[in-house]
């Protein structure tokens, strides 16, 4: 089995300039998937920043009922952690819709983006989010040569 046929990749949050406000990512529909892994890429962190990644879930399409998942906060990052990633894996959320939230406070933190990887698809051959993923390829036992 190869990974790309059993997952769905979505860019859940675009880059956000330095700031101290929390940023909500896109709401993902988890129907058909057992889990989602969020990978938050951070840029420059200013001394005394308090930056972390958490997940929220809800039953409403528009996210009006989103609530934090208990214990889901990863971080906070150390001041020396500029240009590192935070990874949060949510397996079998109890509600249909899930989103990442990058929590920033005290001093500036740059967000390079958040990628969501939904996995354990109940129906294989999933299609990545065309609104955020431009291209995807699978190569099985490729020969060496020009790319």
Model-derived segments and their meaning:
Residues 1-147:
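Surface-exposed, low-hydrophobicity beta-strand/loop segments enriched in small/polar/acidic residues
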């Amino acid at each position: 089995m190869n990974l790309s046929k059993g997952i769905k990749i979505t860019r859940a949050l675009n880059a956000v300039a330095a700031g101290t406000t929390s940023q909500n990512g896109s709401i993902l529909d988890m129907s058909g998937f057992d889990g989602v892994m969020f990978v938050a890429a951070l840029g420059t962190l200013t001394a005394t920043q308090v930056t972390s990644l958490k997940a929220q879930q809800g039953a409403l399409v528009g996210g009006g009922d989103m609530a934090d998942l208990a214990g889901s906060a990863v971080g906070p990052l150390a001041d020396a952690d500029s240009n590192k990633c935070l990874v949060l894996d949510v397996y079998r959320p109890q509600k249909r819709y899930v989103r990442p939230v990058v929590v920033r406070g005290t001093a500036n933190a740059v967000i390079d983006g958040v990628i969501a990887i939904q996995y354990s698809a109940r129906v294989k051959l999933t299609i990545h989010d065309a609104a955020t993923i431009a291209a995807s390829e699978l190569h099985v036992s490729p020969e060496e040569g020009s790319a």
